[in-house]
């Protein structure tokens, strides 16, 4: 299923005409969100992940990627956003309690109060489409289903149990993200060693935060010169510490490249959250700026 085939109106797969219609609808939804956000969402960004080929310590680490913005990827993402936004607004219209994910001034939070999500570009956003994967989605679906049946919803506005669910979920969600970022970091470092890589290209995200190109890895770089967002730099790998998950690097040079468009994406969530898990005491080589960057 390619964009070219869809635009030509020739998709020789089951339900081809339906998929073409849904793709056009998804593109319209995306355009509307981009107008609200005030900027387009970059396409073509790759989500990197690892798989192991073999067993034990001799297993080969394989780096793989999934490109965002492909037709089916776009279709699923936009349908989920559309459903979560619509159902969130539907609960608010009927004064039924729900759990919302909102973003104002760059800060993302879970709340029982309906509010816009600036990063996505929607007036409401209530996670509801993945009840088998997230407990919050199941809570919202129970609220929706009960209301549709004309029954009393399990939770009321200002329900202390609902606040407890939000608090517990926030804590667990943060712990999961922290664990995931550390695993991404560990396997990125292992892959760097396996491939014998001594130099890495990185992109400045903000301040001393950089992201390694082609790996799901980011870290703070104490002492990094002030550089514009999106600036590409070349880093030298000096040392890898798997126990503390610290990669010591030095700045080789600032490259004549910029990738600001790739950094505009917030993944519809905060991009800088994961790097905070990196130990702040990462060693710095004398006369050099350790750096790395990764990822969204």
Residue ranges and their predicted role:
Residues 213, 242-272:
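OB-fold/S1-family single-stranded nucleic acid-binding modules
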């Amino acid at each position: 299923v390619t964009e070219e085939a869809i635009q030509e109106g020739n998709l020789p797969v089951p339900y081809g005409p339906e998929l073409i219609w849904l793709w056009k609808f998804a593109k319209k939804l995306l355009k509307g969100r981009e107008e609200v956000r005030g900027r387009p969402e970059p396409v073509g960004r790759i989500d990197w992940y690892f798989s192991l080929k073999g067993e034990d310590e001799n297993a080969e680490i394989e780096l793989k990627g999934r490109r965002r913005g492909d037709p089916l990827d776009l279709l699923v993402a936009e349908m989920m956003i559309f459903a979560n936004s619509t159902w969130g607004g539907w609960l608010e219209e009927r004064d039924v309690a729900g759990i919302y994910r909102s973003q104002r001034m760059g800060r993302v939070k879970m709340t029982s109060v309906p509010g816009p999500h600036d990063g996505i570009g929607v007036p409401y956003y209530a996670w509801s489409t993945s009840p088998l994967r997230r407990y919050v989605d199941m809570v919202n679906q129970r609220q929706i289903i009960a209301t549709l049946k004309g029954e009393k919803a399990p939770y009321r506005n200002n329900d202390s149990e609902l606040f407890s669910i939000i608090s517990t979920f926030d804590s667990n969600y943060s712990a999961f993200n922290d664990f995931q970022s550390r695993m991404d970091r560990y396997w990125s470092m292992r892959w760097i060693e396996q491939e014998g890589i001594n130099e890495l290209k990185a992109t400045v995200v903000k301040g001393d935060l950089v992201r390694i190109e082609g790996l799901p890895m980011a870290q703070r770089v104490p002492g990094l010169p002030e550089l514009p967002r999106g600036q590409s730099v070349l880093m030298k790998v000096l040392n890898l510490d798997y126990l503390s998950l610290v990669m010591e690097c030095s700045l080789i040079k600032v490259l004549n490249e910029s990738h600001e468009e790739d950094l505009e994406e917030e993944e519809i969530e905060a991009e800088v959250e994961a790097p905070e898990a990196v130990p702040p005491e990462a060693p710095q080589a004398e006369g050099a700026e350790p750096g790395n960057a990764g990822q969204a």
